[in-house]
Amino acid sequence: MEPSDSTSTAMEEPDSLEVLVKTLDSQTRTFIVGAQMNVKEFKEHIAASVSIPSEKQRLIYQGRVLQDDKKLQDYNVGGKVIHLVERAPPQTQLPSGASSGTGSASATHGGGPLPGTRGPGASGHDRNANSYVMVGTFNLPSDGSAVDVHINMEQAPIQSEPRVRLVMAQHMIRDIQTLLSRMECRGGTQAQASQPPPQTPTVASETVALNSQTSEPVESEAPPREPMESEEMEERPPTQTPELPPSGPAPAGPAPAPETNAPNHPSPAEHVEVLQELQRLQRRLQPFLQRYCEVLGAAATTDYNNNHEGREEDQRLINLVGESLRLLGNTFVALSDLRCNLACAPPRHLHVVRPMSHYTTPMVLQQAAIPIQINVGTTVTMTGNGARPPPAPGAEAASPGSGQASSLPPSSATVDSSTEGAPPPGPAPPPATSHPRVIRISHQSVEPVVMMHMNIQDSGAQPGGVPSAPTGPLGPPGHGQSLGQQVPGFPTAPTRVVIARPTPPQARPSHPGGPPVSGALQGAGLGTNTSLAQMVSGLVGQLLMQPVLVAQGTPGMAPASASAPATAQAQAPAPAPAPAPAPATASASAGTTNTATTAGPAPGGPAQPPPPQPSAADLQFSQLLGNLLGPAGPGAGGPSLASPTITVAVPGVPAFLQGMTEFLQASQAAPPPPPPPPPPPPAPEQQTTPPPGSPSGGTASPGGLGPESLPPEFFTSVVQGVLSSLLGSLGARAGSSESIAAFIQRLSGSSNIFEPGADGALGFFGALLSLLCQNFSMVDVVMLLHGHFQPLQRLQPQLRSFFHQHYLGGQEPTSSNIRMATHTLITGLEEYVRESFSLVQVQPGVDIIRTNLEFLQEQFNSIAAHVLHCTDSGFGARLLELCNQGLFECLALNLHCLGGQQMELAAVINGRIRRMSRGVNPSLVSWLTTMMGLRLQVVLEHMPVGPDAILRYVRRIGDPPQALPEEPMEVQGAERTSPEPQREDASPAPGTTAEEAMSRGPPPAPEGGSRDEQDGASADAEPWAAAVPPEWVPIIQQDIQSQRKVKPQPPLSDAYLSGMPAKRRKTMQGEGPQLLLSEAVSRAAKAAGARPLTSPESLSRDLEAPEVQESYRQQLRSDIQKRLQEDPNYSPQRFPNAHRAFADDP
């Protein structure tokens, strides 16, 4: 009930406070309360209005959490906005919360011993109560036709979408009743009660659903919501569903037939009750609706100047009736899809003729940017059907003829409700015909589970999936494989398959014998490349942009696999993805990640021949998943071929979110690379070239199945599509090969970012970076990160010319010239190396500066010699190998010099990133350093370079110096004045090469612990962070830093200064620009090919002499005066102060 009854009294008190409360759904509510009310009383006062129990509320004002025992007046919140967030449930409550009796599909998954632990809150407004949400289906046709991919917002439980529809309608009816009560009791409402009623957030999903439904007349009544808001509010409907019966007994029922979950579906009588209640509400609303029409009819001309009270009353009526109409319309839409098939045998129940995605707008999250802060437990849907599912009622009933029926959540529910312990073949036939192969991706945050189905129809997986009949309940080959890992054993621990991929049978029987199958792969027809590329591009691209990410956990799921031999066929051990580049979710992680893999214990499964002839499309698709999602085995060719990565998620584990991008990094994909330690200059090539696997050929993929198995053109098309999805919000054109330089220049609006010689890009490394960015597109970079060296091969002429001109200064590429140029170049990095290691503890006796400089000289000497001498077709592969080798050895060397302390090495890298990123968005820098730390840990855990390989580079204090070349080049002076060499060197390029190591060794352990430690560290840094939901922390921190930090502004123009008040102009002008004579001379000498007679240092000292500076000042003044006299475009009227600045008298 609204707290308005007490607030009207509070308004009469002389010392009342008007407090604005803003919730996570961006709604602001106004409360007028007594000034002496304490915070705890205020929480209880607003609990009903905000739908959050008082004990779970956290009120934040000016970065501080309001304490319960203090008074509101003490915080001076009168007329101010207080932010309200909901406290995350304690970790100890997670398992019990998962067993809440709210009626979701896993209500009893914890064994059912604690059904009432949540207390009354579970049936009230506990948004953290357990709920399942169906994310939809994705069908891949076998005829090569295009596949349309949509991102939709959808709320539908795996258990029963009709039930959710009724529950949502009941919630909305209660909301309408609340609104009617407020209109009928006018005196007990607040002055500004125009905000949505207490329960309105529960209908956000329906509101979103209406937005894209052009055929529904009530569309106009559903105001569009922001994706963030709608996602957050979508989680509530199923959490407040006391009507849903516990699904504990369900598992026993589903075994006989897939439709045995019918008891969870609502009966027609329940639908009738809801409709009757709607009729009563309409009768109650009628008088207010008439008054509403009267007010609106006269609204254009009514004069409220002297009738403030009347205006308030009319405005209040308009708001409340409008909100009631919105809820009423949404209720009708939710109920309009419910049908009862009278042809079915009794007892009949309701089903849904069209899924919620029917109403939603495709690509809802297209505008989402990275990093995304999300609310734990949000719902995101990905659906895409090669053929539209028939809306007929029979489709939901899993009729044998409905090949697309699986796209409807109800029929999907039949899949997930079947139990692992149901060996009888009886239940198999119905789903066998209605479900093609399924790839399921599920997400669990706290308790809600998000799932996605990808249905891959091959020529033999239609109703004719008879070959799989021997597998009993498994249905068609592909479908059965996904069935085995679905929610088997509700009573014990309902598990969800994160990803299940049916495997070609001949590839699975012998894991080590996988390589022979590569021939079939290479011989597979490429007719469906376009379709596959389009499908995977949209799928991966949209997954990378979604806030909802894959959750992984591990129960003891071996029995599930054992009960389904064909399922075991698809169960290769899944490498635990490295949780690095999930910017969208790093802030939302609320607990540790328990990840494990289940290997099919039934060896007979792989040998089963049910799906005898996998199509070429299937083979290509499975290998493509291997490339993108990472091979499933530690190196066996079989898993690499089929890539059936399966991970089981358990609801009881603490909350964790990991990005779909982690699958791109699993064992072969390319993760965002950690930058090399600041010293290494050879990184210029590595900046973009570092591929994951050993650069020579396609060894990045285990089992001998290199990237060549898939045509580079096909891989390129997939990458192009993924990047188009990711960069579409930044204006990137589809299919565009825009260079990185052009892309950044277009976003920044500056034309000189990558021009050689421009500010911030001086020196050799800056020019090299410019060359790479001007010639490489985003697609080229991703190709390099995945081990394809073709972009480097294409760049060979430009690189060779560049090194000849900028590196050798036009001299002959002899060994002595190369060594001398390398020495000069690397020596210029000494100050950056010293600065980078100044704050870390180095091993006693080790000369870290010399160690790095001499190591870099040797590595870069090899790279430069290769670029200048190699002319054959192995240029790209060898260059890639040199960069990878240099990176790994550099990391191993510095780790050894730092005593094996990974934290010290990470501090060196992150310190350099922060120094290079001054003025950059702090949240982006924070994300970058966190991501680099995670990736660095993965790289170091699978380091292919041993200590013995790098000991020869270690230099001790007192060791004799290395023999120096005869004469350093003049480039050294320019290098010392520019921070760019280090910037290039410290760029996050080569980290992705860890994939090579990961493919050689066992799958990496999950990095959840590391992420949690970092989250904890960031929370400790700010006292308020512990009381704020994780997704709010980066937002608040960014606001704090942006208020503290003022970006440097460019110098003001003369015209601007002339219009400024004199007093302010004096304070703004300062001493004028700094004279950079030494820089100008170095640049001119380099352009002319001249070199100083002495050393660059002595030249710099000479140029800094006062008399030289004064002469330079006079010469500069004279040049400007001459320019002002001769330039026809100069106008003294436009620049009135120019004569004073550059007059003859200083």
Swiss-Prot record:
Compositional bias (Polar residues) at which positions?
A: 208-217
Record GO biological process: apoptotic process; brain development; cell differentiation; chromatin organization; endoplasmic reticulum stress-induced pre-emptive quality control; ERAD pathway; immune response-activating cell surface receptor signaling pathway; internal peptidyl-lysine acetylation
Q: How is it modified after translation?
A: Ricin can induce a cleavage by the caspase CASP3. The released C-terminal peptide induces apoptosis.
Task: Record the organism.
Answer: Rattus norvegicus (Rat)
**What name does UniProt use for this protein?**
Large proline-rich protein BAG6
The sequence repeat ranges on this chain: 236-265, 410-438, 589-616, 622-650
This entry's Gene Ontology molecular function terms read: Hsp70 protein binding; misfolded protein binding; molecular adaptor activity; molecular function activator activity; polyubiquitin modification-dependent protein binding; proteasome binding; protein carrier chaperone; receptor ligand activity
Q: Where is this site: Cleavage?
A: 1015-1016
Alphabetical UniProt keywords: Acetylation, Apoptosis, Chaperone, Chromatin regulator, Cytoplasm, Differentiation, Immunity, Nucleus, Phosphoprotein, Repeat, Secreted, Spermatogenesis, Transport
Instruction: Region 4 X 29 AA approximate repeats: list its residue ranges.
Output: 236-650
Q: Which residues carry this modification: N-acetylmethionine?
A: 1
Give the start-end ranges of region Disordered. Answer: 87-128, 186-268, 381-436, 457-525, 555-618, 666-711, 961-1146
Q: Where is the composition biased (Basic and acidic residues)?
A: 977-986
Q: Which residues carry this modification: Phosphoserine?
A: 96, 978, 987, 1095, 1131
Regions of biased composition (Pro residues) lie at 239-257, 422-433, 502-515, 603-614, 670-694
Q: Where is the composition biased (Gly residues)?
A: 109-122
